[in-house]
A protein has these predicted regions:
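Short N-proximal segments of mature Sec-exported proteins
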Residues: 100-114
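Classical Sec-dependent N-terminal signal peptides that target proteins to the secretory pathway
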Residues: 1-12
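Long, amphipathic alpha-helical surface segments
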Residues: 12-48, 61-66, 73-89, 114-169
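Short, glycine/acidic-enriched capping/hinge loops at junctions between secondary-structure elements
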Residues: 52-54, 67-70
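Surface-exposed patches in mature extracellular/periplasmic domains of secreted proteins
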Residues: 48-53, 92-102, 140
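Early exported N-terminus immediately downstream of N-terminal targeting peptides
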Residues: 53-57, 61
Length: 169
């Protein structure tokens, strides 16, 4: 009896009431791209406690030398920090146009210089392809799922989700 009740509730929630898709039908795609990026980062980063995850706090914000955090952040403070960090990264990748948000989300996780290159790291193949105007970047984006040379399934899932939510062909 309980199973039947649960099934009918689920069926009622999935039954459309008119011809246009509802907010529930669209899910995360109903949000603007920046909001999708924020929600994706929050989901995959998880909450960082200052005592256990120093120098990271909130949803993966790296504490900078001039920042003084003595206790945990509120969710609102962490949300503000995340949005600020992501906005700065979007500005850093602005010249890449429609790929700037996708690159910013990747840089939030791996660091901008693994993508842009510097003295320690060469410019990524992903960025080289984007600069040449090539759009087959999925494989190169998914290559950022390695840690110590091994492909990590959870990171690969994150990259695949990023692509589904933010990649514009």
């Amino acid at each position: 009896m309980l199973l039947f009740l649960c099934q009918s509730i689920v069926a009622q929630n999935k039954t459309p009431t008119n011809d246009s898709p509802s907010q529930n039908d669209l899910g995360i795609f109903a949000f603007p791209p920046f909001e999708r990026a924020v929600r994706c980062i929050k989901y995959y980063e998880g909450w960082h406690d200052i005592k256990r995850n120093y120098p990271y706090i909130g949803w993966g914000h790296r504490i900078l030398p001039h920042e003084k955090f003595k206790k945990n952040l509120t969710y609102q403070q962490a949300n503000t920090l995340l949005r600020s960090d992501l906005t700065k990264l979007c500005a850093m990748f602005r010249k890449y146009g429609k790929d700037s948000l996708l690159l910013a989300v990747l840089a939030y996780n791996v660091g901008p210089y693994k993508i842009l290159g510097n003295k320690r790291f060469p410019k990524s193949r992903l960025l080289q392809k984007i600069e040449r105007g090539l759009r087959d970047i999925e494989k190169d984006y998914l290559d950022f799922c390695r840690w110590r040379g091994k492909c990590i399934p959870s990171i690969k899932r994150r990259r695949m989700t990023d692509l589904q939510l933010l990649y514009i062909p």
